[in-house]
């Protein structure tokens, strides 16, 4: 099966990007500068990412609110038109089928943003129209992100954290949300395909560093943000992942609610997601066993080298009774390596990014 391509593919090729298969899409993993340099550019100034592989499912018309309120875990009554919300699509057992950002664009229009490989699954549950191929999504992230975006569109740069608004780019109507997946301030712009390359180039010309999905992953890991298929999955609940705040406990009903209620009534989940901080540069990897007193108590779900901390870091599920500050061991390909159990994030996130999305 051929890979789907981003509207920005030609721009990535011109920049010498290393392109890889990501969820059925050919996307840039990195550029010639390399993942570490791209990561640090985002932490220190601003980086621009192509995230067009993320789906967009448009749900609109009368009854749209009620459909989403009944299918998604979070409570849309917490927000209003012109706002975005992080939420989950759950199965009957309370497991996470996908984690999603909902852009509430106007009274009866919602743009639901699932992960690349889960768009069809989301459409089958909530209905709506898959408009992924009609637009590109460009994320500008970092402490200098808004300053750079303002050089292209002051209107887009003014969008508040988790706000959603329209902006004009060269006469083309676009959408922007104050969302991201890096632990930094920033925005994500949805732009019609025909204007995508022009907007990308304008952001580069304004001073942003192009960054690939490799840097996006190390950034989200430093920020302690979960990735579906790793820290979230159909057999992992929001409660295990430390995301109970994504559950609308005051809602009357939604798929998976009963299972989550039972877990709470039993005193909570048996395992929890924790951070693991090593004192070595060698990175833990997914699947590495986590041991306590010689006994396997969990496994790494995501691990990598932290360019900011200059050491290996990981996320892992451990028994809920495991306290922060305890020392465990990670079996790093046959080499026991000490790690401290810590509460993510590993990197101090920008104050406006503490609820940022995967």
Give each language-model segment a name.
Residues 1-23, 27-30, 103-358:
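Conserved, structured C-terminal
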Residues 1-90, 95, 214:
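Acidic, proline/glycine-enriched N-terminal capping motif
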Residues 50, 99, 188:
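Acidic active-site catalytic centers that drive phospho-/nucleotidyl reactions
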Residues 75-122:
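Well-ordered mid-protein domain cores that form the structural environment of catalytic cofactors
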């Amino acid at each position: 099966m051929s890979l789907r391509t981003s509207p920005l593919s030609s721009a990535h090729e011109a920049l010498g990007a290393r392109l890889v298969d990501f969820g059925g899409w050919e996307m840039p993993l990195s550029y010639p500068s390399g993942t570490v340099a791209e990561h640090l550019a985002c932490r220190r100034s601003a980086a621009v990412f192509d995230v067009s592989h993320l789906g967009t499912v448009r749900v609109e018309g009368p009854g749209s609110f009620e459909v989403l309120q009944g299918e998604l875990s979070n409570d849309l009554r917490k927000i209003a038109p012109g706002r975005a919300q992080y939420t989950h699509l759950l199965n009957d057992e309370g497991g996470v089928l996908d984690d999603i950002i909902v852009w509430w664009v106007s009274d009866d229009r919602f743009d639901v943003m699932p992960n690349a490989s889960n768009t069809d699954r989301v459409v089958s549950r909530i209905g709506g129209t898959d408009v992924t191929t009609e637009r590109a999504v460009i994320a500008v992230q970092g402490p200098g992100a808004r300053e750079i975006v303002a050089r292209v569109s002051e209107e887009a740069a003014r969008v508040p954290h988790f706000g959603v608004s329209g902006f004009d780019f060269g006469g083309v109507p676009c959408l922007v949300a104050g969302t991201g997946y890096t632990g930094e301030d920033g925005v994500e712009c949805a732009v019609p395909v025909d204007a995508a390359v022009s907007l990308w180039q304008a952001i580069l010309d304004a001073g942003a560093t192009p960054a690939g999905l490799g840097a996006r992953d190390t950034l989200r890991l430093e920020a302690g943000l979960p990735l579906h298929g790793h820290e979230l999955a159909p057999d992992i609940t929001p409660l295990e992942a430390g995301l109970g705040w994504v559950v609308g406990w005051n809602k009357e009903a939604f798929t998976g609610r009963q299972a989550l209620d039972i877990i709470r009534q039993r005193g909570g989940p048996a395992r929890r997601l924790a951070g693991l901080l090593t004192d070595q540069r060698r990175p833990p990897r997914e699947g590495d066993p986590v041991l306590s007193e010689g006994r396997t108590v969990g496994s790494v779900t995501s691990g990598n080298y932290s360019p900011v901390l200059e050491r290996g870091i990981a996320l892992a599920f451990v028994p809920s009774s495991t306290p922060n500050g305890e020392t465990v061991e990670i079996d790093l390909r046959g080499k026991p390596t000490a790690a401290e159990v810590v509460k993510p994030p590993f990197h101090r996130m920008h104050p406006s990014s503490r609820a940022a999305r995967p």
